[in-house]
């Protein structure tokens, strides 16, 4: 988007340049057209950042600097006809900044006052410098080739979320920020903790992450400063290894870049749907302290945050930044919101609460009984599970961040980054509940009946996790002539210690019920008996990722559009996963929970990549990239990518990409899936027959009694993908841009869990037979059986308007439309159209911002389309059809942020969900809302105070 060549280049430096020709000083002769042409400037006084943006727009300059360099600084009015270089010098000197020229229209601003220069626009040229201008080294997501312009249109669509947009959003976590982006789907920690599905009562792996384009989190690669990070220490049965976004404090994030489309040729495995690159802050002048406090309009879900960071410049021109952050959030239970219930009668969908009491073997309720239940349940004996479940876990997070950038010798720099953090998180589930077969002879035994029972006397199921993260990187970089190089070593570690209270041990339950010690009729049970029945369950997970990388980049040969630039590098990695579940889980002695197995695995990998940028003319460029990866146990994988960019007219750019991608099986997937080992009756089919134990339940109704379990699959292969994007970017005038892109991603060999009951041909290893060939068991395992084909559109509109008296107005609108989402569960099956099911097929995010003097006000809106209830195969469920509730309606939420800044201070008020929208969801299994999309807090107020030192 061409307008960002000015506006975004100012708001954040994202550039590397390897200039070999001498660069003139500001105002020197031969500085190019920008220095020679005089411009009638009309720049009102006010914030220095706005004044510089206006100067860049009016003069056609490109200014590069850190955003914190201009924060709190003021500029005087400038209404004169001057050479652009002289005008820039005047603004910079008044603010105590130094200016260095890169070329005729590109300048770098840094701290400190340059030596006094003569006022005339043209000054004597100083001696030519011996090396390139010292511009900070940062890369654009989607390529290893440094770019000299943050706003240059790239072949792949890239969304940039700036620091100012992060602050105006009011989001306090990286997870909240990303899940609000169009085309992103959030995976909430409460949902992730449902280990194995909603029927499993073991809340595990409470990580928070997001995914792009409905392909799941394992197809989205998350990077921090361009490097991979370790996954969350515990693994999710449904989602596998996850990058925990909440482990990265939003206060230390400089910006976020989202590249959509395949990028395995650049970054290797996992980047099939896209890449999210989280860029951390590196430079700051002085100290900055921030205090925030927020609560819902109902006075609950409170959160508070304190952070402090301090940066300085070293004697040799380097930078040091250290920061500390503490975040506290209170738990929000479902009982605090009326809409969080399984009672859907208000929508005509019936009451789905669980009646507690005795049932006969035909499941008829004989009488209600809910001993030990609280008063609000005892009246009706109805268990409303969502009322007991956390809408928001309680959390306490502490983080420490440090950065050092230090020149060692002429042309060689040392960079050290360190990030450490701890997090205590607690979430609550309903009391453990099950259908109990009370043995004959027990005082509460009823003939020919079982008891639907909730263990209220044990208490709710609670999961507490203690997470510790450590990320460190040491890198050297430098220049040799026009060529740049870097070498980096990084270590990433995530450890989770989790404890679950409130579960029931199988053997202890059998013992106390056989002995008649535990009473179901309300007779108080001794605390010692309850403690023996429900022992705490602990587990530990460690995920470690170690990386070594070297790369070089520079000009190769001359082309009509400029020098061809190339980048090449080598990456080595070691991925380690250790999982130590509680012995009771290993022995499958926890009721209604999947059996867990210890994991102690590691995987090594290596990758070699090369990229080249070919500017065949000023209007036509081609990017080529290729990467070869070797993963231990899975051989070699080659991933190419091509990108094209053509500008037939000034301000109009057509672009396209084509790429392949892959994802090697994770260490989690090389193991058995989490399955509850149990006996089951399955219909006898020709594929299953003969069965060792057959039951005839009616005419032509033959069922096999089998043991359900799981196994590993040594023949697992990597998933593969092909993707392309086609689009255009239009910037007819400075200050306005628009882009529209179409994407398609086809993922094959998808790794999915399943068994012979899903498809016997797709899972041939699933059948377990005895020595006579009769079926005795069915094992589930991971196999390469799935396929997904997703197509859609993305757009982005941005505009900036300056007024003489009323300040600056900024408008942005971005959206995503999922035109097609087809899935095939097993080979040969019919493709099912999932677009609009489970999640909306359209989403949009926009804002209008006003800035004048020290004031800033932002009104933002997030809109989501409707969601179909049911499934593509089964359609709308009958109760929903009868009630006319086959589609959950879409919604729009409005937020408001206002801030005022004066020297060294900034105060802001953010109001989330101004209209206090009540969630609505007609999928009766979701308990009244969609945890991936809705914010259960409702209207939320957040007050922030910042002080610069």
Where are these regions (language model features)?
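N-terminal export/assembly leaders
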Residues: 21-118
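C-terminal beta-signal and adjacent terminal beta-strands/loops
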Residues: 819, 861-876, 899-949
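Short loop/turn motifs that connect adjacent beta-strands in outer-membrane beta-barrel proteins
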Residues: 283-286, 314-317, 408-412, 479-484, ...
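N-terminal plug
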Residues: 30-31, 51-54, 62-66, 86-89, ...
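Gram-negative outer-membrane beta-barrel transporters
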Residues: 737-872, 946
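Surface-exposed, low-complexity loop segments enriched in small/polar and acidic residues
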Residues: 237, 338-345, 364-395, 401, ...
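Outer-membrane beta-barrel translocator/receptor signature
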Residues: 187, 238-243, 251-254, 265-276, ...
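Non-catalytic regulatory/gating segments with a bias toward low-complexity or hydrophobic composition
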Residues: 166, 178, 256, 276-278, ...
């Amino acid at each position: 988007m061409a307008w960002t060549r000015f506006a975004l280049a100012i708001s954040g430096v994202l550039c590397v340049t390897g200039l070999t020709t001498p660069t003139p000083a500001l105002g020197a002769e031969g500085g190019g057209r920008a220095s020679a042409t005089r411009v009638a400037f009309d720049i009102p006084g006010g914030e220095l950042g706005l004044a510089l943006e206006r100067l860049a727009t009016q003069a056609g300059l490109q200014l590069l600097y850190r955003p914190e360099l201009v924060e709190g600084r003021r500029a005087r009015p400038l209404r004169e006809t001057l050479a652009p270089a002289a005008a820039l010098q005047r603004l910079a000197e008044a603010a105590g900044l130094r200016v260095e020229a890169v070329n005729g229209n590109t300048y770098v601003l840094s701290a400190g006052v340059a030596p006094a220069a003569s006022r005339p626009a043209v000054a004597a040229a100083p001696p030519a410098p011996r090396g390139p201008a010292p511009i900070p080294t940062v890369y654009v997501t989607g390529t290893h080739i440094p770019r000299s312009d943050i706003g240059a249109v790239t072949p792949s669509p890239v969304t940039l979320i700036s620091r100012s947009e992060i602050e105006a959003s009011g989001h306090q976590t990286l997870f909240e920020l990303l899940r609000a982006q169009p085309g992103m789907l959030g995976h909430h920690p409460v949902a992730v903790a449902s280990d194995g599905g909603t029927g499993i009562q073991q809340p595990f792996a409470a990580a928070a992450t997001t995914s792009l384009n409905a392909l799941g989190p394992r197809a989205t690669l998350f990077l921090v400063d361009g490097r991979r990070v370790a996954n969350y220490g515990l693994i999710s049965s449904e989602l596998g290894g996850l990058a925990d976004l909440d482990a990265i404090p939003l206060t230390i994030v400089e910006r976020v870049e989202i590249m959509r489309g395949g990028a395995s040729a650049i970054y290797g495995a996992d980047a099939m749907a896209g890449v999210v690159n989280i860029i951390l802050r590196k430079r700051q002048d002085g100290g900055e302290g921030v205090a925030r406090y927020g609560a819902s309009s109902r006075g609950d879900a409170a959160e508070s945050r304190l952070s402090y960071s301090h940066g300085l410049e070293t004697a040799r021109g380097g930078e040091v930044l250290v920061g500390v952050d503490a975040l506290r959030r209170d738990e929000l239970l479902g009982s605090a919101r009326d809409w969080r219930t399984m009672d859907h009668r208000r929508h005509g969908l019936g009451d789905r609460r669980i009646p507690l009491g005795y049932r006969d073997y035909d499941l008829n309720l004989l009488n209600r009984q809910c001993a030990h239940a609280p008063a609000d349940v005892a009246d009706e004996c109805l268990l409303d599970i969502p009322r007991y479940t956390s809408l928001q876990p309680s959390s306490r997070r502490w983080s420490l961040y440090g950065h050092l950038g230090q020149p060692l010798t002429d042309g060689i720099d040392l960079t050290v980054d360190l990030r450490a953090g701890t997090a205590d998180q607690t979430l609550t589930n309903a009391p453990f509940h099950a259908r109990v077969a009370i043995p004959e002879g027990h005082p509460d035994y009823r003939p020919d009946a079982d008891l639907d029972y909730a263990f209220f006397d044990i208490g709710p199921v609670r999961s507490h996790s203690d997470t510790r993260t450590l990320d460190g990187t040491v890198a050297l970089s430098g220049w040799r002539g026009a060529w740049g190089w870097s070498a980096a070593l990084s270590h990433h570690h995530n450890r989770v210690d989790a404890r679950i209270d409130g579960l029931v041990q199988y053997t202890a339950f059998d013992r106390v019920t056989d002995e008649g010690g535990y009473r179901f009729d309300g007779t108080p049970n001794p605390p010692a008996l309850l403690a023996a029945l429900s022992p705490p369950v602990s587990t530990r997970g460690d995920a470690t990722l170690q990386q070594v990388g070297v790369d070089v980049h520079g000009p190769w040969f001359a082309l009509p559009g400029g020098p061809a630039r190339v980048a090449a590098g080598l990456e080595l990695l070691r991925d380690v996963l250790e999982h130590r579940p509680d012995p009771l889980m290993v022995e499958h002695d926890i009721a209604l929970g999947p059996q867990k197995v210890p994991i102690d695995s590691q995987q090594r990998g290596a990758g070699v990549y090369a990229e080249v940028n070919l500017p065949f003319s000023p209007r036509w460029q081609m990017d080529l990239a290729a990467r070869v990866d070797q993963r231990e146990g899975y051989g070699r994988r080659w991933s190419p990518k091509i990108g094209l960019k053509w500008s037939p007219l000034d301000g109009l750019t057509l672009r396209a990409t084509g790429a392949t991608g892959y994802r090697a099986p994770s260490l989690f997937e090389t193991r058995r899936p989490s399955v509850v080992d149990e006996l089951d009756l399955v219909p006898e089919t020709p594929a299953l027959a003969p069965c060792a134990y057959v039951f005839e339940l009616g005419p032509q109704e033959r069922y096999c009694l089998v043991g359900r379990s799981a196994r590993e699959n040594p023949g697992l292969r990597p998933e593969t993908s092909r993707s392309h994007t086609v689009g255009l970017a239009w910037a007819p005038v400075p200050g306005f841009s628009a882009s529209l892109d179409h994407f398609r991603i086809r993922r094959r060999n998808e790794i999915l869990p399943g068994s012979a009951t899903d498809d016997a041909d797709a899972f041939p290893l699933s059948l377990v037979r005895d020595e006579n060939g009769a079926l005795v068991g069915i094992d589930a395992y991971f196999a390469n059986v799935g396929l997904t084909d997703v197509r859609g559109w993305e757009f982005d509109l941005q505009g900036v308007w300056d007024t003489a008296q009323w300040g600056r107005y900024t408008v942005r609108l971005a959206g995503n439309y999922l035109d097609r989402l087809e899935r095939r569960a097993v080979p040969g099956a019919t493709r099912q159209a999932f677009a609009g099911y489970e999640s909306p097929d359209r989403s949009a995010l926009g804002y209008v911002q006003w800035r004048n003097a020290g004031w800033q006000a932002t009104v933002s809106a997030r809109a989501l389309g409707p969601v179909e209830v049911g499934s593509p195969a089964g359609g709308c469920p009958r109760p929903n059809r009868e009630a006319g509730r086959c589609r959950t309606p879409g919604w729009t939420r409005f937020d408001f942020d206002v801030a005022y800044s004066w020297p060294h201070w900034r105060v802001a008020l953010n109001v989330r969900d101004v209209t206090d929208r009540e969630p609505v969801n007609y999928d009766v299994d979701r308990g009244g809302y969609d945890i991936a999309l809705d914010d259960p807090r409702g209207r939320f107020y957040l007050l922030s105070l910042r002080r610069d030192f």
